Regions:
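Ubiquitin-like/PB1-type beta-grasp interaction modules and other compact soluble beta-rich domains
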Residues: 1-87
Length: 88
């Protein structure tokens, strides 16, 4: 179930760029989506807080570089989230 994005924009934020089916968790993707973060939160914790199932995220890039989900987020970071792709 999709969790609503937090409404408060008073604290530190990151910009999330969801791709593919992941846009359903963020409402849009064009230009990125500012999302508040808590100090010291990891990418895995951030995704869990928003209700994004781990299996729906294939690749994560922070500030243009592929990273693991145990990476800590900092205010101002840019986070790219890519869904798995299937085709034939």
């Amino acid at each position: 179930m999709t969790q609503p994005l937090p409404e408060s924009q008073n604290g530190p934020t990151i910009t999330v760029h969801p791709h593919g089916e992941l846009t359903t968790y963020f409402g849009r993707s064009y230009g990125g989506v500012p999302v508040p973060i808590e100090p010291g939160i990891t990418i895995a914790g951030f995704l869990e807080r928003l209700g994004v199932p781990s299996k729906e995220v294939w690749l994560v890039a922070k500030n243009g570089e592929q990273v693991k989900r145990d990476e800590t987020l900092q205010p101002g970071d840019s986070l790219e989230l890519f869904a798995p792709v299937a085709g034939g």
